[in-house]
Amino acid sequence: MKTLYSLRRFYPVETLFNGTLALAGRDQETTGFAWWAGNARLINLSGKLLGAHVAHAGLIVFWAGAMNLFEVAHFVPEKPMYEQGLILLPHLATLGWGVGPGGEVIDTFPYFVSGVLHLISSAVLGFGGIYHALLGPETLEESFPFFGYVWKDRNKMTTILGIHLILLGIGAFLLVFKALYFGGVYDTWAPGGGDVRKITNLTLSPSIIFGYLLKSPFGGEGWIVSVDDLEDIIGGHVWLGSICILGGIWHILTKPFAWARRALVWSGEAYLSYSLAAISVFGFIACCFVWFNNTAYPSEFYGPTGPEASQAQAFTFLVRDQRLGANVGSAQGPTGLGKYLMRSPTGEVIFGGETMRFWDLRAPWLEPLRGPNGLDLSRLKKDIQPWQERRSAEYMTHAPLGSLNSVGGVATEINAVNYVSPRSWLATSHFVLGFFFFVGHLWHAGRARAAAAGFEKGIDRDFEPVLSMTPLN
């Protein structure tokens, strides 16, 4: 029976290309896919598909290492990371490597080590990818049955799913261990303007952790994106890691239920479509997280959020005009509302002007000035610290706007290129990639369902009408 595994099924999808181009048995005649269909030619060659995936991982890790070293080589310690267009070093700094109080970089050596480790890893992966693509067995089922599979073997597929879930759970726990035992992580909320600290009092209460999932996604609630303390983030990773590992063990030990066997399409392309859908959702969530959240993505490294820059400008001008003698509690703005401060519909004291729409911003430099009913007028008059003024002035001039039209009142330069923040890059790139992955999901899901239903043939290439028509010239 094992020989059945390596029989190459001719897929019922016909493709246009030179069918005579042969590549070591991976040609159109034997696979049903032309060279440009990429890994589709390897659908039933588990050994070669392994090579493609390992080589792909090598490319990813090589990019990470090379880009990491590139950022280290160009890094200027005197400037904030977000002014230097960095997208990798902020992640390392957030994990607590190389930074001290206020997010100041005190040691770039950990960043160098990270880059070199990724480069070395990519060499190992690259070698493995080339080996399995060119020299290793075409199929794994005969020689290494543990690593072999048949796409329609539902039990094997859920076992592979379980292994992946366990690996994801271990990844979540790596962050937990870093935060608890290996030096801690950067906490933007640490007193005095942020510092690296070990997390000692994890939030493990299910009502708090899962309460985030039940929140509305809109302003003031903000779903999981509203998380604003590290205890909740690390505690959430404990829950997530545990669920992934337990779910992985469950999927390894069990077989799919009858309803799942009936409801799902069990083919390689179907699994690809499911994966693309999941990554698409993650991309959209990551977009919102990096755009709005300044705890998981500290503003010291990624630059301020849009609402944060807008509120920082209101705060900066409040400080300036208060010093010049303005009564910031009662001054009227051009619309008749408060120029510096006003009340929200619920009675909370908030910044006036166009930034009123960002009333629900929470930021480490602003929270000490709040009282039980919003911004506290007496604290604004007596308690503003120099570091809060410096930080808000800095954030006001580094809004993540790019070329947005609606800027929350932030002053922008008409005839110059405005500063572009890594927050803008990370948010927009994840949104665009999330969208394209969603389109890829629709495409592959449609093909997988059609193939499962047995009606995907494509055009008959031997008798299509165009062959009998006269040449254009």
Curated annotation (Swiss-Prot):
It is found in: Plastid, Chloroplast thylakoid membrane. The modification N-acetylthreonine is found at T15. Belongs to the PsbB/PsbC family. PsbC subfamily. The chain crosses the membrane at residues 69-93, 134-155, 178-200, 255-275, 291-312, 447-471. The lineage of its organism: Eukaryota, Viridiplantae, Streptophyta, Embryophyta, Tracheophyta. This is Photosystem II CP43 reaction center protein. [CaMn4O5] cluster binds at E367. One of its GO terms (molecular function) is metal ion binding. It comes from Lactuca sativa. Residues 1-14 form a propeptide.
